[in-house]
Amino acid sequence: MGSRIIIASKNPIKINATKLGFQKVYSNIDFECEGVSVPSDVSDQPMTNQETLQGAINRATHAKNGFPNAAFWVGIEGGIEKVGEEMMAFAWIVIVSTEATGKARTGTFFLPPKVVELINQGKELGEADDIVFGHSNSKQKNGAVGILTGNLIDRTQFYVEAMVLALIPFLNKEIY
């Protein structure tokens, strides 16, 4: 198995979460992780579960097509979805290799009404968080999950668990 992973993002949180997730599963391999910019082909703020999953699939696919010299390509897409008057936040992780594809979703949490109001006005989640909580560039840091949990769950941890779950087909090739 090769050791190069292309992450379809230059966000340091997503790159680090990918490295940590792969290290948990493949502790005997030293992975080289490289973040690249590729389009998601979905809206800047995906507003449904399906759109968010599609964004992660598209990112992984574009990474593979644009940077074919790797063992794995990873797409991570954060999204939100309305549930009645409330709004939940989550992310999808898609891992592609030449042999298999793995997909998993992070845990889900509900956003506070002030953040929801700004999203309904057209702001992205990260921008809404910055306004409501007085932060700057929170989406490159611990994001909404870190802010709302007081960093009990930081954004890296939030992604790592789903990264491991997305690797299930690679760990169980004989049944996937």
Indicate where each model-derived feature is located.
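Anionic-ligand binding patches
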Residues: 44-176
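N-terminal polybasic phosphate/anion-binding patch
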Residues: 2-69
